[in-house]
Structures are given as structure tokens and as C-alpha cells.
Design a protein with these regions (language model features):
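Hydrophobic/aromatic position at a conserved helix-loop-beta junction
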Residues: 118-126
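ABC ATPase nucleotide-binding domain helical subdomain, centered on the C-loop/LSGGQ "ABC signature"
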Residues: 64-104, 150
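Helix-to-loop junction immediately C-terminal to a conserved catalytic motif
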Residues: 23
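The feature captures the beta-strand-to-loop junction immediately N-terminal to the Walker
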Residues: 8-10
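Conserved ABC transporter NBD signature motif
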Residues: 31-45
Length: 183
């Protein structure tokens, strides 16, 4: 608990595939995954595991409705708190409709970095023992990347965080697993 792992490596070495297996999206071709002596499949599917895929889903709904897909009963205060965490609260407050801002088909009304942070906020609304994040910093400027990274490390104080990123944060609080192609 409280562990943060950064999976690094060149394109095509299997970082995202590894996360897909851990998230239960793909079955391993061989071998078994175990966590604390139990088959990893025993943990899936579960509300204890949150997965941010490389391709995020933003729906033609309001910001609030998109966020509440992560926790249906979340009140507006919880939504504003999670938007603060992912550095989107100022943007949302600047919108004429605030939380009721429509995001458009496939999130057309927001940038790629904003879409990733909305999807991340959706995951963070519900406490989870394991967060699997594929490229959570994509499309973010350096300052936002560092702020989101620091927040994730703080949030994971009681859980496990596994991140795949081509733009790793400057902080050294991640253990690093570097994947390489077979020679």
C-alpha cells in the first residue's frame, strides 16, 4: 500500500498491453498474475480497481454527468473537489454553465489534456485500492503534469498506483520498471 510504480520503455515494448492485462481487459498469453498470494483475476472486475486507458471516453453529456459516471451519487461539492485535484476547477468555473457545460460528442468541446483529466477525475471520485493509469500526463504542460503527479502520489498514500507514461514527472517518488524488447 502507498506504492507508486512508473512503467517506462520505448514504444511497442508492451507497457499498455501490461496495463490491459492488469485491468482484466486482456488475458495473459502465458503464466499467471498474482497479488499478495492470490490470483490477480480474483480482484477483477472490482470497484477497487480503477483503469484509465490510453483512449479515454468522454460522452456527449454535461461535465457533471460525465464525472458522475464514476460515482452516481456524487454531490456538486465532491465534483468541485475532484476538479480541483486535476486542475480543472478554474476552467469549469470560467464556463457559462459551470458543471452543466456540455462536453460534446467524444468530448469535442475540450482539449485532449482536459479530456484525460476529466476521465481521471471520474476515477478519483471513488476511493480505489489500485489505480492503473495509461499516459495520464499526455497533453499536459509541465506545470500541470507535475501538479497532477503530486496529487496522484498523495492520493495513493493508502493504495497502489501504476502509471505508464512517455512524459514521466520530474519527481523521484515513483519506483521505475523499465520494459525492453528481447534482444
Amino acid at each position: 500500500s502507498g506504492q507508486a510504480l512508473l512503467i517506462a520503455g520505448d514504444s511497442g515494448v508492451g507497457k499498455s498491453t501490461l496495463l490491459d492485462v492488469l485491468a482484466g481487459e486482456l488475458a495473459p498469453l502465458q503464466g499467471r498474475l498474482r497479488l499478495n498470494g492470490r490470483d490477480f483475476a480474483d480482484f477483477l472486475p472490482s470497484d477497487e480497481v480503477g483503469y484509465l486507458a490510453q483512449q479515454v471516453d468522454i460522452f456527449d453529456l454535461t461535465l457533471a454527468e460525465n464525472l458522475r459516471l464514476g460515482k452516481a451519487g456524487a454531490d456538486d461539492d465532491a465534483l468541485w473537489q475532484v476538479l480541483e485535484k486535476v486542475r480543472l476547477a478554474d476552467w469549469a468555473r470560467a464556463q457559462p454553465q459551470g458543471l452543466q457545460t456540455r462536453l460534446g460528442e467524444y468530448g469535442a468541446a475540450v482539449s485532449g489534456g482536459q479530456a484525460r483529466r476529466i476521465a481521471l477525475a471520474r476515477l478519483l471520485l471513488k476511493p480505489r485500492a489500485l489505480l492503473l493509469l495509461d499516459e495520464p500526463f499526455a497533453g499536459l504542460d509541465a506545470a500541470t503534469r507535475e501538479a497532477v503527479s503530486a496529487m496522484l502520489l498523495q492520493e495513493r498514500a493508502q493504495g497502489l498506483l501504476i502509471v505508464v507514461s512517455h512524459q514521466p514527472p520530474a519527481q523521484a517518488d515513483f519506483q521505475v520498471l523499465r520494459l525492453q524488447e528481447k534482444a
